[in-house]
């Protein structure tokens, strides 16, 4: 065999190896591009810690380990998009209302109107803001990692406690405007219960999937603690007396929205009835979010109308 022929075969062999290597690199590169383009994943592709609702089958943002990627999920459609924006937009609205004292323009001014009135209204606005913003941040950031998911989940629960507490205080204030000792007593009771609830939600076991029905019942019971000042008012002022102080009708609608939302959330209706059909629209968590917003709007209306009732009573 000649030297020239041997060299030619060696060159051909090298070329073949280079070609195979090139094809391999292109395949790997193509796979990398594909992986970058694959933003959404199915339930069975998730790590175990992300598997919460097995009735939602598609549209997941898989563990990112990146704050940038979490924020980027705000700009493409996934099964958390509705959850994020149904609370982000109202949170911003409530915050603007609070910091600009928009309630100056929302409510009439009476001769007896004081800064205390605006303060308690803004307590509710900031409580609603903190609840909705914590919720929105949780749904955006929870896919970062298991550790961050647990952290933001606890903030989400603290936001709910904040909303419940900050909802009760203004109603108690307007209901007992001429009985400061009652207002102080029920405010202290509310804050003590809020502290107890805070200790509970900070416990890691509270955040597990098995505690889902318990979590729903937990927050319902905390909300029902508001019946204590209401019942006391019925005994002290009579039914008509309470109706002259508090806009009870909107409080009723608020409770209906909150309880209905919590029950739907706790039992995962409707996705339990039709898995995979409500991955992007109409899932229990999305319905719960909308119910919370509607309930908060009803409560704001109840507070403003109670303010009007109080000052109409002082200056008929």
From Swiss-Prot:
Coiled coil: none annotated. Residues 111-117, 178-181, 240-245, 301-316 are cytoplasmic. It comes from the Eukaryota. Induction: Expression is regulated by the zinc metabolism transcription factor ZAP1 via its promoter ZRE element (zinc-responsive element). Its main location: endoplasmic reticulum. The chain crosses the membrane at residues 90-110, 118-138, 157-177, 182-202, 219-239, 246-266, 280-300. It is a multi-pass membrane protein. GO terms for cellular component: endoplasmic reticulum; endoplasmic reticulum membrane. Belongs to the ADIPOR family. This is ADIPOR-like receptor IZH1. It comes from Saccharomyces cerevisiae (strain ATCC 204508 / S288c). The lineage of its organism: Eukaryota, Fungi, Dikarya, Ascomycota, Saccharomycotina. The gene is IZH1.
